[in-house]
Amino acid sequence: MKVSYCIPTHDGNAKCQMYLFDIFHALEAQTDQRFDVWISDHSKSKKVYAACEDYADVLDIKYVPNDKMRGNISANTNNALRPADGDILKVLFSEDFILTRTLNQELIQAFDNTPYQWAVTGLSLIHI
């Protein structure tokens, strides 16, 4: 079983490349490496492409430029999902964090042990 991490990206935020490096670094550290990464890029610059090139020798990254409906997150997300070929498709937005080295392992185990074919994940921080 393989996970495809589908990441819609853009260059609307000055930190977009830094966030992508954070995701790539966390994926590189995963204990289970049965995954690939699909990047749909709504950028006008080459920052996202350059980040993908920096990790091309370490991660299985598929870069998909996307100039259609630029700025529409739904269209960009669909563009990342459409070509992905993993058994599990996991959307990660470019500002998302991976907080554990076992995310991929946990996703695969969760789908191995259940009849369900979809799931939603999220995180909420509450400041008191």
Spell out what each predicted region is.
Residues R34-K44, V64-N66:
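Short beta-strand/loop segment that forms part of the nucleotide-sugar
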Residues S40-A50, F93:
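A conserved acidic beta->alpha catalytic loop
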Residues D67-A84:
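Glycine-rich, basic loop-to-helix element that forms the pyrophosphate-binding segment
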Residues G86-F97:
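Short beta-strand-to-loop acidic/aromatic patch adjacent to the donor-nucleotide binding site
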Residues D96-A110:
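Acidic donor-binding/catalytic loop of UDP-sugar-dependent glycosyltransferases
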Residues T114-L123:
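A short, conserved acidic/glycine-rich loop-to-beta-strand motif
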Residues I126-I128:
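Conserved small/polar residues in nucleotide/adenosyl-binding loops
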